[in-house]
Amino acid sequence: MLRTRSLALTVAIALLAPAVLKAEVTTWQLGGSQPWAGQDTVNIMIDFERVPGAIQPVRVEPGVNIISLLSNWTTFRQPKELGYINGERPRIWKWNEGNGDPTENGVALIDADSTTYNSSKAEGIGKQFFTIDLAVPVPAHTFGFHTPSGGFRSDGTPLRTDSTPAFQISIQEENSEIFAIKGPLPLARIVAEPTQNFAPDVRIGFDQQYVRFFRWARKFSIIDETALTRNRVSGSSGGQGNQARSLLGTISEFEIYGEGFPKRATYRSKIIDLGAEQNFGRLFFTATPLRFVDGEAVEAPDARAFAEIEVRTGRDDDPNIYHEYTVTGKEKVVSRARYENDLRTGFGRTCASCDFVQRSPRPGMRAAITYDSDNWTFWSTPITQSGLPLNLDSGSFIQVFITLHSTRFADFVRLDSLWVERAPLLAARVLGEVAPLADPQP
């Protein structure tokens, strides 16, 4: 009997084998003849134009303000937009959290326009600090700022001469917990802290290094004390100490300069609809390590640069699940459209200059966003070698995240294209049973 069952199973497998062999293996591709540009949701320091069909890091050229190489800035430390991920969007924020007021939130300080500026305010010096996050570490050696090209203070002082008396500049290569601490604490390294400055155009030089974060903080100076004394002699009340008089110093632009390639450049593709559920095989890519020598990029097998690729797949078009608070304080699932357009955030301010505070849960308020692991795989293990299997579940949607790494200012990697093996599912569902040939329907 057992031999009969074995024979039946062998015949069944033999009959199925031709169908398996006929499963067509194709590829899904990015790069080469399939453009990179326009297929991304995030790109930080990515050059789409240098070599057609390929991507590589943007090179920081001498004399070019690095701030101008970045776009899609936010003026909050913790942006409320859906999909924000730390390190995938540049930020500038004032004080502890930032705000949306364009007259003071710093947006005028990164617009490359010397006629726009943040007006001085009659508020404490302790609130006068800005933090700049370039999203990735870049090779930098100079931080600068300057006064506006025109205009006047309320007392008639030309803004062009309204220099900042005292300030501190500090820098840091990577993210840390310091940004969650309130107040103008210096970052990992202080590169300048003058106590008496009269220059309207300031340039602070330091040894070139990878820097992601810069913090500019206003400090008290004897020049401020002199202005306060002059104010008292003239019969006016108040001064820098009690915020009755606007602080000295007006800034029009921040500037950051350096030379070379960033430590990281990142690219996140859109979520791509493949049309039908697919099985996925190996990931292939072509990447070329290069070095910038005497004004030209030359191939350099020993370049300290490489590409790292992660992939995830899913069965619907959104890897997240969105929730709203109920009357009992619990959470219920809602659509992304309702979460994004109809619900309020869980944070608010009691005044324009106050920090954000957590509101009590209530209906109409955003609750958690969780990962839909039932329908989406997690990101694959980062792959740095072409031809390795992805080991991902089947899906009808795919997304790619690419990081172009470099640990030398002159070295970089160019990614020409990548492709993923895929094949359609042979059957949505297969049912069967083993039976003796003499009794095929027991």
What annotation goes with each model-predicted range?
Residues 1-9:
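Bacterial N-terminal signal peptides that target proteins for export
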Residues 8-18:
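Bacterial N-terminal signal peptides
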Residues 22-442:
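Beta-strand-rich ligand- or partner-binding modules
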